[in-house]
Every structure is written in structure tokens, then in C-alpha cells.
A protein has these predicted regions:
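Non-catalytic regulatory/interaction regions at protein termini and inter-domain linkers
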Residues: 1-203
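Amphipathic alpha-helical coiled-coil "transmission" helices that mediate dimerization
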Residues: 196-216
Length: 216
């Protein structure tokens, strides 16, 4: 049976999104995270995707779980069948007390395989980078570059959250360079930030997904 090449993002400004997408969100407040991530995961769960939310301050795992439970009266049914995992960042990014980029990337890819083996349509994830120290920034930028290249080959949708209060102008450029597009608030509304090369990359990604769908 063929699988759809795209999925509803749950975020109005984004709309349907191809599998293989790796995009970022710049936020200022906890409410910014709630407004995007709760509908993002509800859409993924209802689209039969396996989901993983890696949390950090200001929105930790316990509160994230409570928010999904409040938004989705049937949330426990998804949780009971193991369709969603909600982790604190130190248990995922900093296992053994240090950041291991290749290990983290392989962990995402392994979960995508597990999702497909279990009959899910894909794997949806998010990670909040609030925990990231300045000393680890350059290593994390390299990790994001690896992720951006790798994820396009898998049925993965990934949203990375960056606090604008922790980013300088150079950081914002680093982040945008390693994501297919960015989501940010402008005058209260969420908007997409795309350059021409990124638009071309998305079009190429859609073509690749369409070709894969035809082959199945």
C-alpha cells in the first residue's frame, strides 16, 4: 500500500508538509511553543505518525503531556499504544552527560524505522534547544547540518525550536542555513521565512517524495 508523500503540519502558517522536512521555529514565550507544538503533535498523531517531543525550559515534559491531554480527549489511547514519547532534553541530547551528535542523529533514524515497522505512516519530532550552552553552539550547528542532509531521505518531519532571547543575528543565520525554512512571529502572526534556494529544495523534496510514492 502506498504512503502519502505529505502530512498536515497542524500549523496554519505551514499547512501540509512533505515527509523529509526539517524546519525551525523562533520563539519568545512559552505560549509561542504551546500555540505551535500542541497542534503540530495532534496532527501527527491523528495522521498515524509516531511522535517524539524532546522538551526543555520553559515547557517541560510533564506540562507538555498535560497540554496534549487537555487538547485531545482521546490522548491516552495514543499514549497507550506507544505512539508518542515525551522526553526531557537531558535524557535525549545529553545522555552520559555530554552531547553526541552522531548518536542523537542515529537515534532519530532508528525511531523512524521502528515507526514504519510498526505500521505508522512516519515519524514526527521536535526538540527545543533552550538547554544549549554557548560553548556547544558550533558543534550543534554541525549536528543540524548533518540532520538537514540526512532527514530528507526518511519519512520524518522535524521541527526545531530556538529561543530568540538566546540567539544573536549570527546564530539566526546559522539556524536558517541548516533548516529548509523557518517559522517566526511577525506582528502577532506566524509567518514562514524562505529563501529562493530553500523553496527550490522543498520543490525537489516534493518531487523525490512523489517518485518514492509511485514506486511503492
Amino acid at each position: 500500500m502506498s504512503r502519502a508523500a505529505s502530512s498536515p503540519s497542524g500549523i496554519q502558517a505551514v499547512g501540509a508538509i512533505p515527509f523529509g522536512s526539517h524546519f525551525c521555529q523562533f520563539y519568545r514565550t512559552k505560549q509561542d511553543l504551546i500555540d505551535t507544538l500542541v497542534p503540530y503533535f495532534e496532527a501527527g498523531l491523528r495522521n498515524n505518525e509516531m511522535c517524539m517531543w524532546v522538551t526543555s525550559h520553559p515547557l517541560e515534559a510533564e506540562e507538555a503531556t498535560a497540554l496534549l491531554r487537555e487538547a485531545m480527549p482521546d490522548f491516552e489511547e495514543f499514549a497507550a499504544r506507544g505512539q508518542i514519547e515525551i522526553w526531557n532534553h537531558h535524557d535525549w541530547y545529553l545522555r552520559n552527560g555530554e552531547q553526541r551528535s552522531a548518536e542523537v542523529l542515529q537515534g532519530w533514524i532508528d525511531r523512524e524505522k521502528r515507526a514504519l515497522d510498526r505500521g505508522f505512516s512516519g515519524f514526527r519530532l521536535t526538540g527545543n534547544t533552550f538547554w544549549l550552552e554557548r560553548s556547544g553552539w558550533h558543534e550543534f550547528v554541525e549536528y543540524e547540518s548533518m540532520v538537514n542532509e540526512a532527514f530528507r531521505r526518511f519519512r520524518i518531519i522535524a521541527l526545531c525550536s530556538y529561543s530568540l532571547d538566546h540567539c544573536c543575528a549570527e546564530d539566526v543565520l546559522d539556524v536558517c542555513r541548516n533548516h529548509q525554512f523557518a517559522l517566526a512571529r511577525r506582528q502577532g502572526d506566524w509567518e514562514l521565512i524562505e529563501s529562493s534556494p530553500l523553496k527550490m529544495a522543498k520543490e525537489e523534496l516534493k518531487k523525490l517524495n512523489d517518485e518514492l510514492e509511485r514506486r511503492v
